[in-house]
């Protein structure tokens, strides 16, 4: 299959690197408005550099769109005109209204997916298998200050990863949304089936954190998106008396997780979906709902 990447910033370079390693990719093309950056990357990974998006599309069966969010609508619109399958980096557009308008122009017969990368992190499926009766859920996604400019608030930039997992893998209809924060730091409390769920995201942290924490009826689950480790803390069911204090010793279990690079899983899945004409796991409809929820979060504080 002939694949292209439009946009070779931080994330786009990773798309190029992985596509260049996939046996299912016959040829790889790239385009970026920064011609020098595109040329250097093309030489590094054996990719053909094209002078325009149109030229790239003429030589591609499917493309990744990895340009800044504010340009998604324009660039993806060009892809739709050429009727090429496309993987759009998250968020799908700057606003849910813009995304809905964009998708009205999607032609039939192509695959359209959205790159919510953490959906492909193996800890998500492992935790989903373990959870039985959740009592409390918390997800933290904190970043140190970065020079990378996204044009989005911390909600659409970082928290949207956890929103995507929450809405599409665990709870369909959160309500009673309360949020506190600003463009760079946000905390949200919501009600999911009478379960308190807390999300927090920051672009001002001193430490990078990617945590998933669930208190279940009989155990507590801790998942780390970065190390791809899942730990279960179980109650032994009995207490010991020690120096006039009740002491409970938990039983700790490490869950065996098959570690993978989530982006590689995502891109391999996209290629397979295009080949087999099957829906990509993260649909535009889900991505739009994620954005709508982000907008609710920002409006709730």
Regions found by a protein language model. Name each.
Residues 1-44:
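N-terminal Rossmann-like dinucleotide-binding module
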Residues 15, 45-103:
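Beta-loop-alpha module in the N-terminal Rossmann-like domain of NAD(P)-dependent dehydrogenases
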Residues 28, 61, 135:
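Conserved acidic residues
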Residues 51, 88-89, 112-114, 223:
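Hydrophobic residues in well-ordered beta-strands that form the structural core
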Residues 62-67, 269-301:
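C-terminal helix-rich "cap/oligomerization" subdomain common to oxidoreductases
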Residues 93-147:
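A contiguous active-site-proximal alpha/beta segment in oxidoreductase catalytic domains
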Residues 115-122, 144-175, 286-287:
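Mid-domain beta-loop-alpha active-site segment that forms a flexible
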Residues 160-229, 233, 257-276:
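Contiguous beta-strand/loop segments that form the cofactor/metal-binding neighborhood of enzyme cores
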